Amino acid sequence: MVLPILYSFRRCPYAMRARMSIVRSGFQVEHREVLLRDRPTHMMKISPKGTVPVLLLPDGTVIEESLEIMEHVLSWDLTENEREWVRRNDVEFKFHLDRYKYPNRYDDIDELEQRAAACKFIESLEGEIPDGNLSDAIFPFIRQFANHNREWFDGQNWPNVHQWLAANLESEEFSECMIKYKQWVPNY
C-alpha cells in the first residue's frame, strides 16, 4: 500500500497544525522531515512555493496548505465562525507574531508594539477558548508566541489561555506530533 507523503518541518506552526490533524484522525502518512534551508528536489517539484506542510496523496493530488490538509484528513467543514478565527490567527496574529519574534527581519519595527498588537488576539481567545479542530488550528501559533518570552507570557492575566495552551502542550497527541525525525534524504 502506498501511503500519502507528508513533507514537514518540526517547529513550523503550520506543519504542527497539519500533523495534529493527522495524529488525531489516525491518517497514515510517510513522514518526510525537511530542513527549510535544504529543501528536497521532489518536494520542490510537486510544490514549487517551497513551504511546509505539503501532503502528496497516492493519486498525485498535492495539498499545500495546512488548513486544507486538516480539512482533508478530518473531513472538517469549517463553520463561518471557525473560518473567521483561523483568518484572524493566520493573517492578523501571525503578522504581528513574526514581527515580534523576528524584528530584525523587518524595517522600523518595534518589538514591543508588535507584541501588544498580537496580544489583542490572545485577549479575544481568553474570552472564547477554541476546542477540537479549531484549537489544533490555532494553538501552535500561540505556543510560538509564548515561547519567545515564556516568563513574560506566563505573567500575563490570561488564565484561560494558559490552561488551554498547557492542556494542548501536555497532550499525548501533541507529544506524538512532535516526535523528532531525522532529515529525510532521498535514496536514489
What is each residue range found by the language model?
Residues 160-188:
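Long hydrophobic alpha-helical segments typical of transmembrane helices together
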Residues 25, 46, 132, 148-149, ...:
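Residues at alpha-helix termini
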Residues 113-121, 156-170:
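Extended, well-ordered alpha-helical scaffold segments
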Residues 127-134, 172-178:
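Surface-exposed helix-capping loop/turn segments at secondary-structure junctions
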Residues 133-151, 157, 168:
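GST superfamily/GST-like fold recognition
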Residues 97, 154, 175-179:
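Short, hydrophobic secondary-structure boundary micro-motifs
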